Amino acid sequence: MDFPLTGLMSYVFDEETNEWDRGLAKIYDYLSQDIVYANPMNLLVFLDNHDTSRFYKTKPSSDLNRYKQALAFLLTVRGIPQIYYGTEILMAGDKANGDGVLRNDFPGGWKGDKINAFIPTGRDSLQTEAFTYMQKLLRWRAGNEVVAKGSYKHFIPRNGVYVYERRLGNRSIVVLLNGTDEKKMLDLAPYREVLPASSANELLSGKSIRLDSSLFLSARDVMILEF
């Protein structure tokens, strides 16, 4: 179980990324030490579990950028992902308030439950957005050998953007994470070795993305390019 990575993921998606010691630069630094593991691909990777604070200590009230970046990373990084129940509906819990709050029942499924999050009408708009996002990623990942078995190559963050590739044979995906609260125009020249075509399908938007000299990313954006 990759507890060090879990610890990092609990806060790096909130920080402004630089090239050395903040935000996603800490992810880069940590994964660069994978040589200490006999087989890092067999590590269990997770955002939280029944013994840790949940990824959200309190339920978010606005955008889900932090959630979307973290979940996309969890499901594309090396290792075997584990998702704790309730993450799909943004269940929150702070270990400082006791372990019981980390293990609250999933809402619904029992007579007398006022809320039933097992059905779409039992989820609020933010929960629906989170559920739909996770569902799309999981359906894509199921049976995807590139993500499950592929090599992991990453680049030191540049201009606040962390880029990594998963590759298996002649198939690959490239993930781009903007670890800042600013829009970025990313120079693609340093990444040409992992960008084998002039365009790629971007999973989350469903759009075809041109890969010319640069690529625009919104604040806290995440892209998953398929080749």
Kindly give the residue locations of the regions a language model identified.
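Beta-strand-rich binding/interaction modules
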Residues: 183-205
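Conserved alpha/beta catalytic core and glycan-binding cleft of carbohydrate-active enzymes
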Residues: 1-97, 179
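Aromatic- and acidic-residue-enriched segments that line the glycan-binding/catalytic groove
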Residues: 95-107
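Glycan-recognition and catalytic regions of carbohydrate-active enzymes
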Residues: 27-32, 85, 92-97, 112-173, ...
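Short clusters of hydrophobic/aromatic residues that line enzyme substrate/ligand-binding pockets
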Residues: 1, 55, 106-108, 147, ...
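C-terminal beta-strand-rich structural cap/linker in extracellular carbohydrate-active enzymes
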Residues: 211-227
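Short hydrophobic beta-strand that contains or immediately precedes a catalytic carboxylate
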Residues: 176
